[in-house]
């Protein structure tokens, strides 16, 4: 997910994307702690995507 792609999105789309990523991160953390997650770097990538979305949202708000 690139910030340039996020800049083209509306605020509502960004909020829904943030919610989806947060849910996905929760599920990945659960899988990680139960030992079912094979790609252990995925939670870190999702965290970075959430940070990108929040940065773009903050920039669009003001």
Curated annotation (Swiss-Prot):
Record's keyword terms, sorted: Ribonucleoprotein, Ribosomal protein
Coiled coil: none
InterPro entries in the cross-refs: Ribosomal_uL29, Ribosomal_uL29_sf
GO biological process: translation
Domain of life, source organism: Bacteria
GO cellular component: ribonucleoprotein complex; ribosome
Annotated protein name in UniProt: Large ribosomal subunit protein uL29
Organism for this UniProt entry: Geotalea daltonii (strain DSM 22248 / JCM 15807 / FRC-32) (Geobacter daltonii)
Taxonomy of the source species: Bacteria, Pseudomonadati, Thermodesulfobacteriota, Desulfuromonadia, Geobacterales
């Amino acid at each position: 997910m690139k910030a340039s792609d996020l800049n083209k999105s509306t605020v509502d789309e960004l909020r829904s994307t943030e919610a989806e990523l947060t849910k996905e991160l929760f599920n990945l953390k659960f899988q990680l702690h139960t030992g079912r997650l094979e790609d252990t770097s995925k939670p870190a990538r999702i965290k970075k995507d959430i940070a990108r979305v929040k940065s773009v949202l903050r920039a669009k708000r003001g």
